Amino acid sequence: MSTTTLTRREQRAKAQHFIDTLEGTAFPNSKRIYVTGSQHDIRVPMREIQLSPTLIGGSKDNPQFEENEAVPVYDTSGPYGDPEVAINVQQGLAKLRQPWIDARNDSEELDDRSSAYTRERLADDGLDDLRFTGLLTPKRAKAGKCVTQLHYARKGIVTPEMEFIAIRENMGRERIRSEVLRHQHPGMNFGARLPENITPEFVRDEVAAGRAIIPANINHPESEPMIIGRNFLVKVNANIGNSAVTSSIEEEVEKLVWSTRWGADTVMDLSTGRYIHETREWILRNSPVPIGTVPIYQALEKVNGIAEDLTWEAFRDTLLEQAEQGVDYFTIHAGVLLRYVPMTAKRLTGIVSRGGSIMAKWCLSHHKENFLFEHFREICEICAAYDVSLSLGDGLRPGSIQDANDEAQFSELHTLGELTKIAWEYDVQVMIEGPGHVPMHMIQRNMTEELESCHEAPFYTLGPLTTDIAPGYDHFTSGIGAAMIGWFGCAMLCYVTPKEHLGLPNKEDVKQGLITYKIAAHAADLAKGHPGAQIRDNAMSKARFEFRWEDQFNLALDPFTARAYHDETLPQESGKVAHFCSMCGPKFCSMKISQEVRDYAAAQAIEVGMADMSENFRAKGGEIYLKREEV
């Protein structure tokens, strides 16, 4: 039954069943491996795709094979991708980073929650059935201390998180010996610095320079360290979250697990409905990837959805609430200034950012400057105490290609650059959010402007969508722009699902969006020339040429769909070993013909070689034995 035909009760029951029966699961013919670091507790997970051998000759009774190396790939699924790990959503994930956080001895447990709203929720017995049972006691920096990865990097410290990331970014490519797999075209990197081998010191230096961030709140010890930066692999974010009209805690946890399985490097919880606090707790305690939020959404819920009633005090309380739960990065729309709002009046689609429109409405109704801008230093102080990274929101991003690259968009971007420098004064990590809707020929300017205006802080974009004519297919229209801007230097791409502009995505939409954006990110890595990026492509091409169908399925980003499409027309097991597919059939398969041409050429070379030897034999007088000096 399609998810869209289920009732709300049935959807919740289905999600609950998914959670109750959840166990660590590997992709087909893959296994979880761990690469260890200098410390015994630095164990970096990767997925290793096992491949079948290549038939190279012999006879039917005595075939000869050549082994194909297993291909290691980056894995975001955390414990959910390890069949050896017992999963219990009620208890949450293991606290991977807790020993590292404790060993630094610069944070302390709080006697009570700092947020009045959190204290109110915890005191409400009516929420007991919804509440995650194993609540953590939150930590914050000790007085006079800073606990951010940027602070450590500037002090010259290589943290365990940085070593973990260095191993992870190398993707196990040092294991690959085959020259065929290691071959890679030189890329065009537009000034990015892409070392052949990523070291912990390189990670530290990039973070120290502000060119990369490690979103890792000390209250989210379950997360596996990852990095967002121009000189690393392009990352992908997935958005989940309930709304006032649909979705439940069970469904959001299901979407979280599903997102990490299909390659989400980070997940943003954009919940705006009931039980935001409780939903977020379940998500954080079960997330192996960093979690981001837009705090203004929840702050607005606290004032009954009336933007004019927002206050700095309510917003500050929300920041404390979320920081102590473990949110790894906040999207803050502090660049929507009062003087920029009139610039949007001549736009075709005005202000399309939800956070941007909230702050614009507040500014106009009070005729005051954006309180997020006015209190930005206080925001930084809060972030520094928990190591919450800032994602400076593009509240004035274009919502149509007609509005792309206009005065409002770039005015805000320049302000975000000023705010970046302020955040760095507090050792707070920063990335910059970008558009939006931009036609292809105008995309590169966005990257250039961001690098110049925002001092090379990582760029994080929503697409951009390259045309406005394809509702229902905006994962395609935006995937084109995402691949381009990723190539130009964008560090993280926020996925767009087929439901963009139409409705709240379900589980299948999340998968479609992620696959599309993993393609875009990988295409960008190839174009940049990221070391090792081509290994999987080469393995796939070799498997394709050798008609190793099972390996083709297993090397695919989505093995299940690849297999299903093949089996629609060749469902028999014999189709998995056939030297053709249903598109061309046995007589017109280009790969099969190419193999025959190669075999013929090899045979011809042998014949030519034998003819040359024969001619040489005759030229030397037909002697069977030659004198020593003639040899």
UniProtKB/Swiss-Prot annotation:
Function: Catalyzes the synthesis of the hydroxymethylpyrimidine phosphate (HMP-P) moiety of thiamine from aminoimidazole ribotide (AIR) in a radical S-adenosyl-L-methionine (SAM)-dependent reaction.
Ligand binding (substrate): 239, 268, 297, 333, 353-355, 394-397, 433, 460
Name of the protein this chain belongs to: Phosphomethylpyrimidine synthase
Subunit (UniProt): Homodimer.
Pathway annotation from the record: Cofactor biosynthesis; thiamine diphosphate biosynthesis
Manner of cofactor binding, per the entry note: Binds 1 [4Fe-4S] cluster per subunit. The cluster is coordinated with 3 cysteines and an exchangeable S-adenosyl-L-methionine.
Chain positions recorded as Zn(2+) binding sites: 437, 501
Cofactors (names): [4Fe-4S] cluster
MF terms in GO: 4 iron, 4 sulfur cluster binding; carbon-carbon lyase activity; zinc ion binding
Binding site for [4Fe-4S] cluster: 581, 584, 589
Family, similarity comment: Belongs to the ThiC family.
Enzymatic reactions: 5-amino-1-(5-phospho-beta-D-ribosyl)imidazole + S-adenosyl-L-methionine = 4-amino-2-methyl-5-(phosphooxymethyl)pyrimidine + CO + 5'-deoxyadenosine + formate + L-methionine + 3 H(+)
Keywords: 4Fe-4S, Iron, Iron-sulfur, Lyase, Metal-binding, S-adenosyl-L-methionine, Thiamine biosynthesis, Zinc
UniProt gene name: thiC
Class of enzymatic activity (EC top level): lyase
Biological process (GO), any one: thiamine biosynthetic process
EC number: 4.1.99.17
Keyword Protease in annotation: no
Cellular component terms per the entry's GO annotation: cytosol
Keyword presence, Chloroplast: no
Entry coiled-coil feature ranges: none
